[in-house]
A protein has these predicted regions:
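Conserved AMP-binding/adenylate-forming core of the ANL superfamily
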Residues: 43-44, 53, 63-106, 110-114, ...
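Conserved structural elements of the adenylate-forming
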Residues: 80-83, 213-216, 246-268, 274
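Conserved pre-ATP/AMP-binding loop-to-beta segment of ANL
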Residues: 197-235, 242, 266-274
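Conserved S/T- and glycine-rich ATP-binding loop of Class I adenylate-forming
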Residues: 77, 99, 116, 147, ...
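Flexible, non-catalytic linker and terminal segments flanking ANL/adenylate-forming cores
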Residues: 1-45
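Conserved AMP-binding A3 loop
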Residues: 73-75, 223, 231-258
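Short hydrophobic alpha-helical segments of the AMP-binding
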Residues: 109-117, 123, 253, 260
Length: 274
């Protein structure tokens, strides 16, 4: 067995620049910037998925996710994203279709977040703590057509009812046990059976994750305009009334990612832990 040495990763360069006096008079907040941040950095405008795709190409064998002990490499997740993207297209998802995520932090969230954006669809995040009334209100407000959720009693029954109460058209179910490592994937159904929902597999509006991704992963390319196309709709906390959907373009979200990378992430590329 030949063990390959991991690729050498160049440390992030931090060029210290100091804004001129005239600049700080016009933009006084520049004085508060950390010295390591290049205040005049040009932020690239790209589709959000491009950031992931570049990382997957550069670090295919590095671990991207560690979910309760089950590890996924960038290559693993990239394959799932590609297949999920084509699967979404096969059920009618296209550019600007609203794809809702009613999920906790889990691998399925990452897969569908990027799969939907890759084909130009718009993600709508739903808190898994929402009551049925809140779910229905947000589905109607966002015009969500497809919902992704887990096969848990706390989540799935709420969403299945929405097929009759709202304009929701499809549900994609990601079984939790399929995302767990051995032996948790065996023990969970045995000891937590009451927490697992009965899925309406005979209903054509309900699709299982493994069936959706049973394809070659070659989705039809979709042209995305970073400044114009909405990547996701993120709802506010609703402290002053009902939550309001904030429409975030690909350009705005990628800008935020690059800014966070410059200002907060001090590790070398691919070494960060979140």
């Amino acid at each position: 067995e030949v063990k390959k040495s991991p690729p050498k990763i160049a440390a992030k360069s931090a060029v210290k620049t100091t804004p001129s006096a005239s600049m700080t008079q016009t933009f006084p907040w520049l004085k508060t910037y950390p010295k390591e941040i290049k205040w005049d950095t040009k932020i690239p405008e790209t589709p959000l998925y491009d950031i992931f795709e570049k990382s997957a190409a550069q670090f295919p064998d590095r671990h991207l996710i560690d979910f309760l002990g089950k590890k996924y490499t960038y290559a693993d997740v990239s394959t799932l994203i590609d297949r999920a993207a084509k699967g979404l297209q096969s059920i009618g998802v296209q550019k600007d279709t609203r794809v809702a995520l009613f999920l906790p932090n889990c691998p399925g969230f990452i897969v569908f977040y990027y799969a939907a954006m890759k084909i130009g669809a718009t993600i709508v995040n739903f808190s898994p703590l929402y009551a049925a009334r809140e779910v229905a209100t947000q589905i109607e407000d966002s015009n969500a057509e497809v919902m992704v959720t887990l096969d848990l009693e706390a989540l799935y029954p709420k969403i299945y009812k929405m097929l009759e109460r709202t304009e929701l058209k499809k549900i994609i179910v990601c079984p939790l046990k399929e995302q767990l490592p051995f032996p948790k994937n065996i023990l969970f159904p045995l000891f937590k059976s009451k927490e697992i929902a009965k899925i309406h597999t005979q209903d054509e509006r309900v699709l299982m994750f493994k069936d959706l991704i049973n394809n070659d992963g070659k989705a039809k390319p979709v042209k995305i305009s970073p400044r114009e196309d909405v990547a996701l709709i993120q709802y506010t906390g609703g402290t002053t009334g009902l939550p309001k959907g904030a429409r975030l373009t690909h350009a705005s979200v990628t800008a935020n990612a690059h800014q966070a990378d410059m200002g907060f992430l001090k590790e070398d590329d691919s070494q960060e832990r979140v």
